[in-house]
A protein has these predicted regions:
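Conserved H-loop
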Residues: 34
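Catalytic core of pol beta-like nucleotidyltransferases
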Residues: 1-28, 37-42, 52-110
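Short beta-strand->loop micro-motif that forms the acidic, two-metal-ion catalytic signature
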Residues: 47-50
């Protein structure tokens, strides 16, 4: 894992915000991609998968918004994907390339 102090600060602020605004909704937060693999460059974004217990597209959108707002005050460039547990399990069952990539790279943050 190759995270800057600013990445750590952003992640902690985002996790706290999710806990406060959406209590009990987050099942897992997974870091994946180049930052998780330790191959990040200055131009790399921070790939994050948030798995929630349930919800629709409105809730998913509402859960990504704070992350992007927090990023405006930093140099962190997040790429946030929110899926329900059911959607994540379906990707697992289908062994999709996205699921395989996340499984290979993932660092569990929550």
């Amino acid at each position: 894992m190759k995270l800057t102090q600013e990445d750590h600060n952003w992640l902690e602020a985002y996790r706290q915000t999710l806990d406060q605004q959406f209590p009990g909704m987050v099942e897992h937060i997974l870091l994946f991609g180049s930052k998780a693999r330790g191959t990040a460059t200055k131009e790399s974004d921070l790939d994050l998968l948030v798995v929630i217990r349930r919800g629709d597209w409105r809730l998913k959108d509402a859960m990504t918004r704070p992350g992007y707002l927090l990023a405006t005050a930093s140099d962190v460039v997040p790429s946030i994907i929110v899926l329900t547990v059911e959607e994540w399990e379906l990707l697992q069952k289908q062994q999709t390339p996205f699921w395989l990539t996340v499984q290979q790279d993932a660092v569990v943050l929550q």
